[in-house]
Amino acid sequence: MALVPYVENSLPALSKFHNSSAQFRFANHDLRLAQDWKKHGVAAVVWDAAVVMCMYLELGKVDLKGKEVIELGAGTGLVGIVAALMDAKVTITDREPALDFLSANVKANLPQDSQVSVTVSELTWGEGLERYPAGGFDIVLGADIIYLENTFVPLLQTLDHLCSDTTVVLLACKIRYERDTNFLGMLKKQFSVEEVYYENQRDIHVYKAWKLKQRRDL
């Protein structure tokens, strides 16, 4: 859901993106996410991977309460909003042009007491990483963020910076093309990776990753 160009072959499936909003119920809250495909493109619509990520979070297999969480390529902010509703301290990020739209969705969907635990912040992968604490997050979330090959290396650089040895990375994606599988191969050179959830109707995979332990005797 990062603010980057995207081409989808199944054009009829895109009709839902032209709706002005998308409604969901997660974490015992009714959510209405504004969408604006014409003005903002892919960053301003709710992709299936974000929905499935929220479904996975609701299963309770990852403890979010009080955890330092960062969402990459947040787009409409659905995943970060749900994480905040589940009592995480969340930094929700995307590229600068998406931030006003993202911030508006956060404010519209989070109660005031939850907003204090949320920061909306600019993050272009691989750039300005010193603004974020190295290894400073317990959980990194990303939904539908691995579809452009020229972003793979900076994304991996970003993950390496944000993650400590105990950080859990959760990535939700649809495996559309060979390049998507190639990214997972690149990820496995630096992280242990396992599939933890699959939603058949939407054909979305959720992967859990954590940094490979470095040998201390080298």
Give residue spans per PLM region:
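S-adenosylmethionine-dependent methyltransferases
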Residues: 1-218
